[in-house]
């Protein structure tokens, strides 16, 4: 809708995790280096955490698209699985077919991993949104981490999730799994206005923008403040701001448009937020209740009953 108006070939701020639009902050670069190192060197279990919207899934998809063909990846993005469902997913994704019981599956999986490892091939199991895994499934993941040769792990495991994943792994019942974590990575939000400006410019250029000053400097500053530096929040603000700017016929997105959008999505900095209707009504309700109580007491003291 607004793409042609702003000279864009496609929408630059879609919320889908399109690897083409990935922007590497120093934090993203560090996480990618750790993931690459963990997989290449056969470290075993890698844990990646980050706030909602910081780009965990985008990084995973970008990495999977660029892994060597010798790497077989099993990617599980639904953590709400029972143990049988989890193993069904693993067996399907890793092409292990002849099994009926868990012990048979583990035996066949071990043979398949050993065969691949002996031929110089690597196998990676990635579980996204892992903070939602049950303790029972996490214990099974610990068992899968036992597949190893004398020199390296035969199955690389990557768990990604929100910061709550760290709390889940601190469960005393999962201490054996926690002890097997070889690498921990944290994806951080964009740290400042300058990085936010580079992020916005990068996405505009990927979308075919002919000009990079669509967002005025003061609007970028306010976007950073409203978004807390989280890419998904930035995308949401920018996408809706471009739509509002198009509707208003504004070639440049100023701060006022960002303020309106942020207010609509309840993303204004706390100091600028208007109280909700309930909050605005609360003092009046308190006063009204107090007044009724005072009037009732006054009537009781004077003997009025009407």
Q: Where are the regions that the model predicts?
A:
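Conserved NTP-binding/hydrolysis module of P-loop NTPases
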Residues: 10-13, 71-72, 81-100
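Short regulatory helix/loop adjacent to the ATP-binding pocket of P-loop NTPases
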Residues: 62-66, 165-180
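Conserved AAA+ ATPase "SRH/arginine-finger" region at the nucleotide-binding site
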Residues: 76-80, 168-172, 182-195
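Walker A/P-loop nucleotide-binding motif
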Residues: 41-63
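Mid-core helix/loop region of P-loop NTP-binding domains shared across ATPases and GTPases
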Residues: 82-85, 98-140, 149-152, 194-196, ...
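Conserved small helical "lid"/interfacial subdomain of P-loop NTPases
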Residues: 189-216
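The conserved phosphate-sensing helix
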Residues: 120, 193, 227-239, 251-254
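Trafficking entry modules
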Residues: 3, 9-13, 253-306
């Amino acid at each position: 809708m607004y793409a042609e108006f702003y000279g864009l070939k496609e929408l630059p701020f879609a919320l889908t995790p399109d690897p083409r639009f990935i922007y590497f902050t120093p934090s993203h670069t560090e996480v990618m280096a750790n993931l690459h190192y963990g997989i290449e060197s056969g470290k075993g279990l890698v844990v990646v955490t980050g706030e909602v919207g910081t780009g965990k899934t985008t990084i995973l998809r970008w990495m999977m698209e660029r892994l060597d063909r010798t790497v077989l990846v099993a990617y599980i993005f639904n953590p709400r699985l029972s143990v049988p469902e989890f193993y069904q997913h693993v067996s399907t994704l890793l092409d292990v077919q002849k099994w009926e019981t868990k012990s048979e599956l583990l035996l066949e999986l071990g043979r398949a991993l050993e065969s691949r490892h002996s031929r110089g091939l690597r196998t990676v199991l990635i579980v996204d949104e892992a903070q939602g895994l049950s303790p029972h499934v996490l214990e099974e993941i610990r068992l899968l981490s036992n597949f190893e040769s004398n020199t390296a792990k035969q199955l690389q495991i990557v768990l990604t999730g929100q910061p709550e994943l760290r709390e889940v792994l601190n469960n005393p019942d999962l201490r054996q799994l926690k002890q097997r974590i070889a690498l921990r990575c944290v994806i951080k939000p964009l740290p400042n206005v300058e990085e936010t400006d580079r992020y916005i410019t990068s996405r505009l250029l990927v979308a075919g923008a002919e000009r990079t000053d669509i967002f005025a400097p003061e609007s970028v500053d306010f976007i950073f403040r409203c978004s807390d530096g989280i890419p998904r929040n930035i995308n949401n603000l920018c996408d809706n701001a471009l739509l509002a700017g198009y509707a208003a016929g504004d070639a440049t997105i100023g701060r006022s448009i960002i303020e309106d959008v942020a207010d609509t999505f309840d993303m204004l900095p706390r100091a600028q937020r208007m109280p909700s209707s309930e909050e605005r009504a609360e003092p009046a309700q308190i006063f009204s209740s107090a007044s009724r109580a005072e009037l009732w007491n006054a009537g009781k003291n004077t003997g009025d009953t009407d």
